[in-house]
Amino acid sequence: MGADENKVPNKIQSIRQNKIKNDVQNAIQIQSFLKNIKSKYILKQIFDNIEKDKVFKLINYNKSIQNRLEIGLDDYKNKFLNVIKIEIIPKINCGKDKFINYIINENKYHIFFDEETNERKTNSFSLTNRASKVKITLYFEESSLKGLFKDCECIEKINFIRFKRKDIIDMSYMFYGCTSLKEVNLSNLITDNVKDMSFMFYKCQSLTELNLSKFNTKELINMKSIFSRCSALEKIDLSNLDTRNVEDMSYMFYECYYLNDVNLSKLIVKKLKNVSYMFYGCYSIQELNLANFDLNSALIEKKLVFSGCSSLKVFKVKGYYRGDVKDMFKGCSDDLIFNLEYPKEI
């Protein structure tokens, strides 16, 4: 063990006793102490005994420590470098005091870091009277982004610049109530282990188009109300989604009034239990291809699935549908209902 490492126990004890005050000078002193320590294990011991907010401060103020953590502590970096970099364009003169809130667990520590102003906020970040473009770095520990932008009515555009997390399991309510959101770039999102996307885009009523084709959804279970009340949504690409483990698609496109371009023909559903109200009120849809959906299964809840799809003319499903057509297709054209009740033999 080197001479510098012999000092470690005493330094750790000092850290415990003093609890590292919230000033930059202390952070700089600790950085100076850490410079010459090469041992991954010793570094880990030190960081384990520093309060999390101080670790974030160290990382922010010293790129060399950040680099050493990233390169040298592969198992440990996930704890402190769970970074998401986001570019946000707020609505001009929104007039509402709205915050980005990381609400999953109030007992955990989260930092929003404004790269333009060096402003740091814990647990929430105000967008009130912000500039035309805001770049934010979010540090967090949980494997969840539930409700991250919930009710942020002032955001018009979101771009995920950097997204290194692979262990996120919950993205439910992520953009819930973002009524001004017009554009969101999801290409960098890693969704490999996400199980819950329910209400993810609920009431994003300014979105006209969404591309989820790059999402890896092999673990996804819950899609309830994911696009519900996206009343301006016209086109959505779900062509590459893996839905083999999805159990709930109820209210999925509920009241997506202008949706007219959605291709579900490649979706494979094996564990589906609920599709009730899935397309309720989608009065612009003219064609639906659900070739892999077995709507005859008694195990699937399917109340009013296509109710109000008044423009629906072409409907494809696995086999002939033998259920209560008038309930599932309430409000659809008489011709469509007749053809479903009395299918022509091929």
Where in the sequence are the language-model features?
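Short loop/beta submotifs within extracellular cysteine-rich repeat domains
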Residues: 131-133, 152-158, 180-184, 206-210, ...
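Core hydrophobic positions of leucine-rich repeats
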Residues: 144-152, 169-179, 195-204, 221-232, ...
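Conserved, compact domain cores that house catalytic/ligand-binding motifs in diverse enzymes
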Residues: 158-171, 175-188
